[in-house]
Amino acid sequence: MRTIIEPFRIKMTEPLKITSREERVRALREAHHNVFLLDAEDCCIDLLTDSGTGAMSAQQWAALMLGDESYAGSRSWKRFEKKVRQITGIEHVLPTHQGRAAEAILAECVIRHGDVIPNNSHFDTTRANVEYRGGIALDLPCPEAFETDVPAPFKGNIDVAGLRRCIEEHGREKIPFCMMTVTNNTGGGQPVSMANLRAVRELVDHYEIPLIIDACRFAENAYFVHEREEGYGDRSLLDIAQEMFSLADGATMSCKKDGLANIGGFLVCRNHEWAECFRNLLILREGFPTYGGLAGRDLEAIAVGLQEALDYDYQVYRHATVEYMVQRLSDIGVPMVLPAGGHAVFLDARKMVPDIPPIQYPGIGVVNALYVAGGIRCVELGSVMFGKLDESGEERPSPLELVRLAFPRRVYTQSH
């Protein structure tokens, strides 16, 4: 694969600490073989997450100086609200300090004990917020999502037939909303097609069930739709994103991903009664509805970042970076989720170390080995993160044992 030129100049740098193998072995032992307990400075290449770890642009840094820190009705809030409404087309906009806060407010207002929340795949904080309220987080990925080496174009899709069976089994009264995660992080950063979203919209409309989008990587999903779905190749990413949100009744968002910021999120909805409940909880948990736990300068940076995330040249670079890594690893026979996801490389730990059974956590073994070998910090997305106990108390492994190497935005070059 050809070298990609990063579409930006670097204005500021941070030195990397190069450690020896012996130092890394000692650090990992002191961290009890839990990479989350490592000191960040001991991680030469930190691919633990793409959330809040990116580099802001010069325009975002400049926007910080415009921050209006008024408690209520600040100029920064107005700019933030205007940008979110432009992209989503949704009336009620509530800022939060990050995405999980938006999920928690949604869950507390809407979910009751025993409710079922179907999703293409919940990520960990979404699942935790559903289950904390006594709900059942039900993953319904499309069948091809489980075939990691099959390069289907939209492996993030939901199983629409499975969703229909779920609704018929549990009943509309037990499903306060259906959720779609774009892109599907748990399933390998894979995209959701517009056709799949429309099919879900048609189905939930029939049963009068609201549709909520987990929009953390909405711009990356829009790029995939532009590149892979017929009829969208001549549309702007903003136009595609607007169509995507037009199919939803609301959305949660971590602006630490496709807001290109280090903190922040939002919750949007069309339902006036929901919005009133959301605002009341926002005041209690986060802050006044025009700042939501964020400084005015953060609202400014997010407003700029949301626009920059929809820049086509940026997305070309972003996806080419991931594709380059996938191609290089594939060339030497490393099993992984194909095709390349939008924000990360997902290694198939079950195939990499087939002698380690799932209940002995092959993903953790691969994560620790990568750190010892090269100072690379990444994360397991398998039975440690998503495993469950069955009714007898026995451990039930996750369907997939993945290791995610998530790429912080605009931080590392191809040389890294």
Predicted regions: what is each one?
Residues 2-33, 37, 43-54, 60, ...:
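Conserved PLP-enzyme active-site core in the AAT-like
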Residues 102-105, 344-349, 387-389:
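Beta-rich nucleic-acid/ligand-interaction surfaces
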Residues 161, 283-287, 378-391:
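Conserved alpha/beta core surface patches that mediate binding of polyanionic ligands
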Residues 276, 354-362, 410-416:
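Short, conserved charged micro-motifs
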Residues 279-282, 300-308, 343-352, 398-405:
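Short acidic (Asp/Glu) and glycine-rich catalytic loops that position anionic groups and cofactors
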Residues 322, 350-378, 392-398:
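Active-site loop ensemble at the mouth of alpha/beta enzyme cores that anchors a bound cofactor
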Residues 322-323, 337-349:
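Conserved glycine-rich beta-strand-loop-beta hairpin in the small C-terminal domain of fold type I
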Residues 385-416:
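PLP-dependent enzyme catalytic core of the Aspartate aminotransferase-like
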